[in-house]
Amino acid sequence: NWHYRSKHESLIAFSNIMYYGNKLCTFPSPDAMESKVRLALVEDGIYDRGFTKRNKREAELLVEDVVRRLKDPKLSHSSIGVVTFSTAQQDYIERRLADALAKNKLEDVAYEREEPIFVKNLENVQGDERDVILFSVCYGPDRAGRVSLNFGPLNQVGGWRRLNVAVSRAREEMVVFSSMTSAMINLSKTNSKGVAGLKAFLEFAEKGKTTLAINSEELKISSGGGIGKYIAKELRNYGYECRYDVGVSEFKIDCAVVDPKNKKRFLLAILCDGVTA
């Protein structure tokens, strides 16, 4: 039950908690203190619900981010995949992206590589993976500010499975471009498991793993810390900043020492043979 695709366990934490009962074992990375799933809120995004079924502003900002990454020597080595929640948004982003790549002479950087950039929707992305996944939710407030609970494939039977596949494609980073927050989705008006999953995923992207919109009965919370707690306490007496029980799956690092030169990373991990060993 080990998960190998994602280099950061935050990238699979949502699916693990929501859909796999926290049964997937993941290994914390040295920079596990920061989630690699981020919400890019598009406050002026409008979903054209009655006509084109597109969200132009969301697409524009996503394409700008792709161009930024491909131009940056430090970021361009990471492969990119774009996932949309509708075919209309997929088609629009494909056209905008083609124009932007041609204008900036980035076609070779984007496509002449082992893993070329792709633009897909959540119904045909299964089997694909990339270092960086950029989402365009598309759905959100219309021109009157109303949010419809019709989210296309997510409302259909098995919509939650499509969501689960889509949000587990990234190896290094996931950015969610959305014109709505989780608070805008009213679950009292729908019993769709796919819509409930979208609300939970948006909240996960907004706030992190501890604030899922839907509680998971299977999520196990560590109760003691075992020997790792005492090791951390002793190391603190020597001036080291430490954390114990590090990790979001059932597999935990008993004690981790924070890098004094970079507080966002761990310097050392300590694993024990048992909780009282």
Question: Model regions: which residues?
Answer:
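Short glycine-/polar-rich loops that comprise or flank the Walker A/P-loop
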Residues: 34-37, 129-132, 170-174
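Catalytic centers of nucleases
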Residues: 248-257
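Amphipathic alpha-helical transducer elements in NTP-driven molecular machines
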Residues: 5-8, 12, 59, 63, ...
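Short beta-strand-loop-alpha-helix junction that forms the active-site gateway
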Residues: 256-277
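Conserved motor-coupling elements within RecA-like helicase/translocase cores
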Residues: 105-133, 140
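Conserved coupling/interface region of RecA-like P-loop/ASCE motor cores
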Residues: 1-29, 85-87, 168-169, 179-186
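Conserved helicase/translocase motor-coupling segment
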Residues: 22-101, 225
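Helicase C-terminal subdomain and adjacent C-terminal extension
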Residues: 1, 16, 144-246
